[in-house]
Amino acid sequence: MNEKLTPSIGVIGSGRVANAIGLLLHAKSLTIAFVHSRNTESGNKLASKLNCPFIASIKDTNADIIIICINDDEVQSTIEQFSKDQKVLYTAGSVDIKMLHHEKCGVFYPLQTFTDHTQKMDNQFPMLIEANDKELFLDMIHLCEKSGLRYEKCNSEKRKEYHLVAVMLNNFVNHLVYLSQQEGDVLASTIAAIYHRRMSEAGLSIHSEDVMDSVLA
């Protein structure tokens, strides 16, 4: 049986998620066809890292699969600009795939918090995937396997729950870290460390920036 051909990938966005996913795919020798971003400066920087062109107009983009790494509230209006037969993935955690009405649409949601543009994908946290097209779903599995990513099939309803829990826990732990750092609250420090470890073991990323290093010391 012939090996499945790896599709070319377009990246829309130039923020933390776009950088993490783009750099991982590029490191695994997948073809990045372009980067498009409303932020020309950061978009050009990412394109340079991925050794691909920066495309200023979304109308000029072309790739087998386009990964949309932008704010949740901008996903629908962006997807609507593509033809129905264009395969698109988005990384938003709270957007229900049924609300988009795009024929070949998928969710490529990393259950991981990214603190800056240099943070890499962590295989400890799974990629939650969903698609309304069988061929696209198989493409997503192929991408995950090619790039060495853990993945789990997850519908929009369940993904929203995970996303909400991750955000709530993230905020809770950050508050505990603040108390421990600003007010010397030893109990808050201990609880924050416990939650951080437990959630990491469960596959939920918690972002408390560099201060967590001292809490876990």
Regions found by a protein language model. Give the residues of each.
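Rossmann-like NAD(P)(H) cofactor-binding subdomain of soluble oxidoreductases
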Residues: 40-45, 49-120
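Internal alpha-helical scaffold of NAD(P)-dependent oxidoreductase catalytic cores
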Residues: 42-49, 119-161, 165-200
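Electropositive phosphate-/nucleotide-binding environments in soluble metabolic enzymes
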Residues: 15, 40, 72, 108, ...
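Phosphate-coordination loops involved in phosphoryl transfer and adenosine-cofactor binding
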Residues: 5-8, 85, 124
